[in-house]
């Protein structure tokens, strides 16, 4: 599983009785036919997994639910992929994804945009059933800092994610160049990257932050910067929204389903570094706007994107599958 998918499934494990995550090292994906041999299903009555290698777990006796946490086969992703990834996505991974669809009992996706993208790119009929269940966040764990001071003296911007081209890390130095002097971008390095960005006074690394420490990291920040080019349904955005942060993001994929432009943050043309800097500067100059947008985002999380809501929908789905 990818990092976000792994976290989402781990969250389900903490909330649903008899739901167990069986992890495997990413290196085993080079020998996917070995996966059933190195993992133990322990008498499972239902399999819930991502589509990448689901075909190898598709036994007729056990119903399988697959969830698209993202869709890397998307052609729009190719400019942001390595040569190896381009070949992998266009050949074996696409074949395995189609096999997974055939073997699955039910297909879900974490956003409307992901569901539509899967249908379009794989040539599926528009009526092909893909149930959308939005990712959720623990709104009791990720909370705003009730003692935060909103002022114009400094503004702390957070980039949360791996330093990959898909996440838009390569735009950070250029965005930083256009920011006002009182603004600093703090960036995480994720779990899979040791890259360090250029040494700029307003660009600072916070290293790899453990998941359990992320609520405190968001509380220390004023704005979330999300220049990613493709997201199934970003957990980082949900976490930041729950902590009362406005979000400045690319206007693409599922991000408009999370962020309401002008109310919870700003959506910029993809890769427009000047637009990103302009919106960040605007938020830095207006503590009141940051507070209003942060409160709007927190309310939206409580209404639509809580962990409890996500769990309830998956529980209903699993019960339906097992009953039928």
Model-assigned labels for residue ranges:
Residues 149-167, 173-180, 186:
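Conserved donor-binding/catalytic core segment of Leloir-type glycosyltransferases
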Residues 208, 216-221:
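Short alpha-helical donor nucleotide-sugar binding micro-motif in glycosyltransferases
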Residues 246-249:
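Short hydrophobic beta-strand element within catalytic cores of glycosyltransferases
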Residues 275, 282, 289-304, 310-316:
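A short, well-ordered alpha-helix in the C-terminal region of glycosyltransferases
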Residues 87-107:
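Membrane-proximal helix-turn-helix segments that form the acceptor-binding/catalytic region
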Residues 261-262, 266-273, 282-287:
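Conserved acidic donor-binding segment of nucleotide-sugar-dependent glycosyltransferases
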Residues 229:
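Aromatic "clamp/platform" in nucleotide-sugar-dependent glycosyltransferases that forms part
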């Amino acid at each position: 599983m990818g990092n976000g998918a792994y976290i989402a499934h781990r969250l389900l494990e903490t909330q649903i009785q008899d739901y167990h995550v069986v992890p495997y090292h990413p290196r085993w994906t080079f020998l996917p036919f070995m996966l059933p041999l190195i993992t133990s299903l322990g008498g499972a009555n239902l399999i819930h997994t991502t589509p990448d290698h689901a075909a190898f777990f598709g036994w007729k006796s056990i119903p399988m639910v697959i969830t698209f946490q993202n869709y890397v086969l998307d052609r729009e992703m190719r400019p942001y992929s390595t040569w190896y990834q381009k070949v992998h996505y266009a050949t074996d991974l696409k074949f395995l994804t189609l096999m997974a669809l055939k073997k699955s009992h039910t297909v879900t996706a974490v956003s409307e945009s992901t569901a539509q993208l899967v249908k379009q790119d794989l040539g599926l009929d528009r009526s092909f059933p893909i149930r959308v269940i939005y990712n959720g966040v623990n709104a009791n764990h990720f909370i705003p800092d009730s003692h935060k001071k909103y002022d114009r003296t400094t503004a702390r911007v957070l980039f949360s994610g791996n330093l990959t081209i898909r996440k838009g890390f390569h735009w950070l130095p250029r965005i930083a160049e256009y920011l006002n002097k009182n603004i600093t971008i703090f960036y995480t390095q994720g779990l899979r990257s040791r890259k360090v960005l250029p040494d700029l006074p307003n660009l600072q690394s916070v290293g790899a932050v453990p998941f359990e420490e992320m609520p405190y990291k968001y509380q220390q920040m004023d704005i979330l910067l999300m220049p990613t080019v493709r997201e199934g349904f970003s957990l980082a955005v949900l976490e930041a929204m729950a902590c009362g942060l406005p979000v400045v993001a690319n206007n693409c994929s599922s991000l408009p389903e999370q962020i309401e432009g002008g109310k919870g943050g700003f959506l910029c043309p993809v890769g427009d570094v000047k637009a990103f800097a302009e919106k960040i500067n605007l938020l830095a100059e207006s503590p009141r706007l940051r507070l209003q947008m942060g409160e709007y985002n927190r309310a939206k999380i409580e209404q639509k994107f809580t962990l409890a809501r996500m769990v309830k929908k998956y529980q209903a789905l699993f019960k339906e599958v097992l009953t039928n």
